Amino acid sequence: MDKIERIKELVEKLNRYSYEYYSLDSPSVSDKDYDEKYYELQELERETEYVLPYSPTLRVGDVVLEGFRKYTHKARLWSLDKAQSLQEIIDWHNRNVKFVEEARGRGENLPDLKYVVTKKFDGLTINLTYNTEGILEIAATRGTGSIGEEVTAQVKTIKSIPLKINSNDILEVHGEAIMTQEAFNKYNETSDTPLKNLRNGAAGALRNLNVKETARRNLSAFFYDVGYKEGTPFKTYMEMMEFIKQQGLPVDDYIRVCTSIEEIEKEIDYVRDIRFDLNYDIDGLVIAIDDIRTRELIGYTVKFPKWAIAFKFEAQEATTKLLDVEWNVGRSGRVGPTAILEPVELAGVTVKRATLNNMDDIARKGVRIGAEVFVRRSNDVIPEIMGIVPESLEGSEEISVPEVCPACGSHLVLNGAHYFCENTLSCKPQLVKTIVHYASREAMNIAGFSERTAEQLFEKLNIKSISDLYKLKEEDLIGLEKFAAKKAQNLLEAIEKSKDCELYAFIYALGIPNVGVKTAKDLVSRFESIEGLKNATFEELVGVQDVGDIVAQGVLAFFKEEKVLQTIEELLSLGVSPKYEEKEVIASAFEGKTVVATGSLKNYSRTEIKDKLESLGAKVAGSVSKKTDYVIAGEAAGSKLTKAEELGIKILSEDEFEEMLRR
């Protein structure tokens, strides 16, 4: 094979591999195989000076452009009318019903109304133009809707966008360039000027003349409309979406067909529920009539198509005033800042507090007391301050670190980016949180133990170590608030019962940094005893599934602490007896599979179904993804079941699950 033919073969293979990896999430080759072919292609292109216009090597952002050229779209990119209440959707639907009835009265043969519901992505709209050879010729921003700015070099850095498609028609496809949360976090870890939000990250990347900077932001995209196409027109929107998908353009998994307001309302509730679990931002839903002929007849206003509407969710980002900063002590002794905010409505809740990670983060973002700040809420966690409104800095105050621990007055020590209180003997928040963690359900499971109990043990009984729990007597507890003889006896019995525990629960209870329940189980499966784990080397630790360098270093440092070793020795001498029994994996259809259980099951609690699946060799996951093999759905299964249906994952009822066990 000559070099030109080899170049063509490599380009075809590499583009197919990219489609499998980025669009199907199902790679057929390893990264190593891909890289070898990519480097071979680079070398051949250098030797021959022959580069196909859709070669993957053209994605590399290594140019700085002089400016943006204007581009006139072949078909207008319309804005959408917006609704913020269900009543507005109902009014819009009623207008559509009336129009269809009147059109039928004039002799038009229109089908019953059917709506297609999709997510409204919060990024930057882009328009791709492919020529008659299927090659990506122009990429442009929406601009005015009629005229945009050419951003072809920038868009080519988005690896999920095919540089060549199968269509031979001149084609314009509309989509949204987005930045995922994962890409956003990774970029901000190393950026001197952190991005404030995902939308600005995407928009700023495409409007950057330095294409290398665009590539650094690792954008993604979803496509949802063919604005212009020569040849046979589409009959329905669903047919159009199928065409887009067949061209290898990335299409979101979520797309719903609804025939009633009740169905639309259900989809609004569902997407609102999963919104913060997504890896990217959406700000609502788009509801559009499916039938293209009906669309043509309904037409447009001056600004909007009448056949579609956007339902907008509550904002997940807002600006408000930073009133103060409060410093709190965690279980590890880390003293961290929390922002006290002027209350603001954000994604349906009133926000008064937000995360400020550390002083380095505060300095990078330029956050000051009294300034207006951008606050963002995602994934149902405490909101985070993303940056400041520059115009509000006048009269603001610098945030300063307390000189001593706010809880115990001890000297603070800077370790990396964080400040720590090293008073592990009498700093109340550290000790209380350590004891509460030790007693928690997934750890030693001491029933009836609360944070208030831990505070009283510290304040009135001078309990300063988890081992002190096993020295408590009934007369000690009766003197505490709300502790009568019965409650005291129950707590002592629960403490005694905790001595007989599983090894993974004991390891988790010790509070090793970055070791959760799953990691504790993985460590136990490898080392089988507390002694085995104490004596593990770094190489042995990183050899455990899902254990990386940070966790391994944390485990090694933990077991070097003399106080830790003394506490473990004392716990064992007081009768705590962690046990490890290697669970026999029962051969089954679930061995090696990823399974999610959702809803209420008749014969299993959450813990029981998890234990059962693990005994069958399954990996039990908490959320549904493309990597999920089975979803076991009980009564009142919610969004996880819906997502499984979207992704085409095998769904089992409880009866079907048990039938598979009997085979």
From Swiss-Prot:
To which species is this protein native?
Answer: Clostridium beijerinckii (strain ATCC 51743 / NCIMB 8052) (Clostridium acetobutylicum)
Q: In its keyword annotation, does this UniProt entry include Metal-binding? A: yes
Q: Which residues form the active site?
A: 120 (n6-amp-lysine intermediate)
Q: Which reaction equations make up its catalytic activity?
A: NAD(+) + (deoxyribonucleotide)n-3'-hydroxyl + 5'-phospho-(deoxyribonucleotide)m = (deoxyribonucleotide)n+m + AMP + beta-nicotinamide D-nucleotide
Per the similarity annotation, which family is this?
Belongs to the NAD-dependent DNA ligase family. LigA subfamily.
- In the record, which residues are listed under signal peptide? none
Task: Output the superkingdom of the source species.
Answer: Bacteria
Name the cofactor(s) required for activity, per the record: Mg(2+); Mn(2+)
Q: Does the keyword Metal-binding apply?
A: yes
Give the protein's recorded name: DNA ligase
Matches recorded under CDD domains: BRCT_DNA_ligase_like, LIGANc
Binding residues for NAD(+): 31-35, 79-80, 142, 176, 312
Tell me the PROSITE patterns matching this sequence. BRCT
Group of enzyme by EC: ligase
Q: Which SUPFAM superfamilies match?
A: BRCT domain, DNA ligase/mRNA capping enzyme, catalytic domain, Nucleic acid-binding proteins, RuvA domain 2-like
Q: In this protein, which residues make up the domain named BRCT?
A: 585-663
Recorded GO MF terms: DNA binding; DNA ligase (NAD+) activity; metal ion binding
Function summary: DNA ligase that catalyzes the formation of phosphodiester linkages between 5'-phosphoryl and 3'-hydroxyl groups in double-stranded DNA using NAD as a coenzyme and as the energy source for the reaction. It is essential for DNA replication and repair of damaged DNA.
Q: Which gene encodes it?
A: ligA
One Pfam entry name: DNA_ligase_OB
Q: Name one GO cellular component term.
A: cytosol
The EC number of this protein is 6.5.1.2
